[in-house]
Amino acid sequence: MTLFIRSDESGSFDYIHNDYFVFAGLIFTDRQQMELTARQFISLEKKLRSKNCYKNLPELKAAFLEHKDRRTLFAITQDCMRFATIIRLKKLDCQKVFADKKTKQRYMDYAFKLGLKNAINNLINRGSIFFEEATDIDIIMDERTTATNGKYDLGESILKELKGEIHSSVTKRTFAPTLPNTERVTVSYGHSDSNPLLRAADIIANRVRFECKYGSLNNIWT
């Protein structure tokens, strides 16, 4: 089995000017469903392009869309597996996390990894995927400034998190592996202007962050 994961982020990882930072996206277990969702998203985008306010935009990113159009695009993925990781920036140990670019990147990777693990555990609990299956994980994230070895380290870190037992030095507990037969985790970065599912992930991340700031988390998936 292959898990296809497409993810984007919303907000700036800056605790001075922002309260929330969000990773969000889609998880697919079937390539055909993934490709169908991409075609549906593109089709709706083409309809929205008929509006004068969007004709000159290079891509329909959430930040440039009217609220009702963001909701319409969000609804395209209502039957898909969606996930989000919400970081409350002002709750972090700011001196440690924001000490330099490397510590910021390490924390962002850590948060993404744990959020993804929780999402996969939810899928296992729902019976959407099975604990014992041999699994490849294909992750594409929207492009950001990351060193080449950073991409490799994130993939290796996710593989270790999912495949091996995890011992908590805080709780002194040992947690069983999530997907012990995971074979490969590949992480790559793409451009949303050429990948409709990254644009869909952008819409999801924007919606989650909006509800964090102005609404209720209970409203996110409706």
Predicted regions and their residues:
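Phosphate-ester processing/binding pockets and catalytic centers
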Residues: 1-222
